[in-house]
């Protein structure tokens, strides 16, 4: 390979460069197939007709659950703590969209450098506590329907004011209550921790 000389070497491989393999009794005795989202096989995995268990409802778990549920005969989810899941609105990009994005790479990167976290999301300059209930819900609906991590930018104090955050939490919990029919399942899916204190999960029809 190539050899480089530099005054400083910054290793930016990140904390996710190696999979965190769980250790618990009985794992090695399991007779079925085991998969880890951090070491997913390159070839397709078919869960058709299978009984599947997924451990965990973090970002990777949420994305796996929604895909496996459409194939497996039966899916059991082992959850410790429910997550706030916002729609990702993943979809194939059309040729025109791709060409337009590629033609404006420089502008998009320049704009991202001026935003919080490097994402092309504009933070609302209003407090969640400064608006009426109608205005709050209107802004939150807009953010919800846009999807993605920009949801947290709906108001500027979700990350700084407890009461503002509670207002955002309850909005998401209401969305879950309306999406899930079974009251027992609803209660298991409702998160009560601070909105945004953990990585916001993005899903596609998760609820």
Give the predicted meaning of each segment.
Residues 1-28, 43-44, 57, 72-207:
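N-terminal FAD-binding dinucleotide-binding subdomain shared by FAD-dependent oxidases/monooxygenases
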Residues 32-35:
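Conserved beta-strand scaffold positions in the cores of enzyme catalytic domains, especially
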Residues 37-49:
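A short, basic/flexible loop-to-alpha-helix module at the beginning of a structural domain
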Residues 49-50, 73:
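Short coil/turn connectors at secondary-structure junctions
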Residues 50-58:
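Beta1/beta-strand and adjacent pyrophosphate-binding region of the FAD-binding site
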Residues 61:
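N-terminal Rossmann-fold NAD(P) dinucleotide-binding loop
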Residues 64-68:
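Aromatic pocket-lining residues of Rossmann-like dinucleotide-binding sites
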């Amino acid at each position: 390979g190539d050899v480089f000389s530099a005054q400083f070497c910054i290793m930016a491989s990140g904390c996710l460069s190696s999979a965190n393999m769980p250790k618990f009794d009985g794992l090695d005795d399991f007779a079925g197939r085991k998969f880890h989202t951090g070491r997913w096989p390159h070839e397709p995995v078919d869960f058709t007709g299978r009984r599947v268990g997924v451990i965990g409802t973090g970002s990777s778990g949420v994305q796996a659950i929604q895909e496996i549920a459409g194939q497996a005969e039966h899916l059991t989810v082992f959850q410790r703590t429910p997550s706030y899941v916002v729609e990702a609105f993943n979809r194939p990009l059309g040729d025109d969209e791709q060409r337009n994005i590629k033609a404006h790479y420089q502008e998009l990167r320049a704009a991202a450098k001026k935003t919080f976290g490097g994402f092309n999301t504009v933070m609302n300059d209003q407090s969640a506590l400064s608006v009426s209930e109608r205005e709050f819900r209107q802004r939150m609906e807009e953010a919800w329907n846009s999807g993605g991590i920009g949801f947290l930018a709906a108001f500027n104090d979700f990350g700084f004011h407890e009461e503002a955050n509670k207002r955002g939490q309850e909005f998401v919990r209401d969305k879950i209550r309306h999406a899930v029919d079974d009251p027992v399942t609803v209660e298991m899916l409702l998160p009560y921790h601070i909105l945004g204190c953990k990585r916001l999960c993005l899903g596609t029809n998760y609820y």
